[in-house]
């Protein structure tokens, strides 16, 4: 069930909200949310609800064991030393990564073994469960936080179930860290201010997805997949670039739109998830970009992989090795395809170069910092080419499209396809470019200053009405677009 589907907007969401707020007490509300979340998942994956329940039960058990092995008042545990706790973590990782590996990578491994060694192994043909990359990572987060003493283990399996399966973040994130919402599972206090802020966030996310991402998806698909050219090598340089830029905008508004909707839904039920995006396309370096893009995944790998491997505490060579491990895993996390592996290693190269420059050539590293526009242009060039690799069906398509972008095939500079797409989508392109900028925080800061100088009555009320009118218009336009049956799937549902 998609957040941007009629079934969700007109059926599941209003019914769930109504029942939730009619129920008395935190316990009943939590149980209902878990039941609603399992129904939400079963709507698209009825068979894999059993896999979800196995993931919940397994991580609940590993969490209890992690808490037990931390106890210092049990003499027989002291005699065993740290090994039971470590073995428990190894088994937990094997359990979660085993689930992820079998369903996500089995076909990829079999295919590569057959091609490399001339084998005839049968492809298991397993269907990828929606959201498995997210809920397995959340399960690991829960157990690791308990193991580290950063959170208390839950005695009730239903509480762990709610954390893992809560429907706003279940399908495509953000990856919610257990220690960030542990207290809110049974100690949150819903209020109308949070609810209203959640509705605002949800509408903004819906607008990003339906009004912007879906339109750019159509541009990217037509050109990337060669539907507009008899011979893809005839694609003009400008057309190749407009396809790459369209996908760059599509994936941002698609994924950040989903994240906004997830954060908004969480707020409606009293949960405060950490933001997942912070205007990544204004970044002045590749390192800065990854501090702003998919922040829940970046921080997960930082805290659970990079730092345990030694982080920045060891010498530069070891830091580079740690960085390599993180970005190899990041690429694989996104999918069972060599394009994702290369995409991860592509970013590793740039991040490693930036790290080396900061350590060994600080003056060179500071040059881009002194010229923000230059730093942003270089970063966006790296990002756009990276998205071409990410979007391509295979490495040959990625190499071909990048070659077309730089005219290495002798393809023309421009053509009628580029001209048509620019004229047809000029308004969306302009709106998207503005929406990528952090204008809203600047506007809020300016309004705060005006409130101080002129008083809230002079500024806050009329601008508040204007904001509400804009949100209402955005909602109506999004619903109208959905009524037309426009392009709708979320990109990160595939991961």
Name each model feature, range by range.
Residues 1-494:
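Membrane-embedded transmembrane alpha-helical bundles that form the catalytic cores
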